[in-house]
Structures are given as C-alpha cells and as structure tokens.
Amino acid sequence: SGFSLVELDGNIAVIGNGAGLVMSTLDMLTDNGGKAACFLDVGGTATTESVYKALTLISNMRNVKAVLVNLYGGIVKTTTVASAFLKAYDDEIIILPVFARLMGSESEKSKEMLKDSETQLSGSIEEAINKVVMEINK
C-alpha cells in the first residue's frame, strides 16, 4: 500500500512522512493537549493514489474530528500529497478540518495548490498543532 496506518484512541489524525517526523509530531501534539486518533506514515514510496486511499481510510474512522499534516518533502514530494488531498476534497472524502505544515521539496508549489482548498496552512508545526487543538476544543 505504500503507507503505514496505526489506529489510536484520540480524535486527531496525524499524517507525516518518515517514522521520526511522525513520532515527534505525535509527541508535540500530546504535549499541547491533543490526542491522536491515528497516525499515517506515507513513507518514501507514496503516490497520489496511495495517499488518497489512506485519506479514505481516515475519513471512515468515526472518532477522527480533524487532520494534522506535517510533511517534509524529500523523496516524497509535498505536491504528491497535495494532489491526493485535492482529489479527496473534490470527491468529498475529506470533510474534516485539515491543518498542515509543508516544507522541503516542492513545498511552495504544494502550498499554491492548496491555498484555495479547505486546508489551513501553517508556517510551523507548532502553529499547526495549536490550531488543530483549538479546533478540537471548540
């Protein structure tokens, strides 16, 4: 499938690329009062199709109330993930609030792709975490 998805007992889906980035994002989220519903590591072989499939799985999890994305483009370009999100929005797969920090390879292009979407882009992961925790605690 090109990704690993682990279910937890919170209400925020965490998406990242690479185990280290995903784990540190989970720690930061927990430290700021958030609870992960699942974490998705899109890995180094992600395609638009595999990320779309993962978003479909996340959208079917009843406890998920928001999505937090922390990507650093390298092997996997951030535009690959942005394309999957745009398709998921078009197909009404993702109707949850999405908060994202995108850096690295093609991140400026992916931010441009997502600027008119429902995704709320942040300049840092700390900002994205604060926004998602505030959304959940409304």
Predicted regions and their residues:
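Short basic/hydrophobic patches in alpha-helices and adjacent helix-turn junctions
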Residues: L57-N60, K87-D91
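Glycine-rich, proline-tolerant flexible connector loops at the mouths of alpha/beta enzymes
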Residues: L71-V76
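Short Gly/Thr/Asp-enriched flexible loops that form oxyanion-binding sites at enzyme active sites
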Residues: K77-A88
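Short, acidic/small-residue loops that bind anionic groups at enzyme active sites
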Residues: A88-G104, S122
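ATP-dependent carboxylate/acyl-activation modules
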Residues: S1-V69, M103-K138
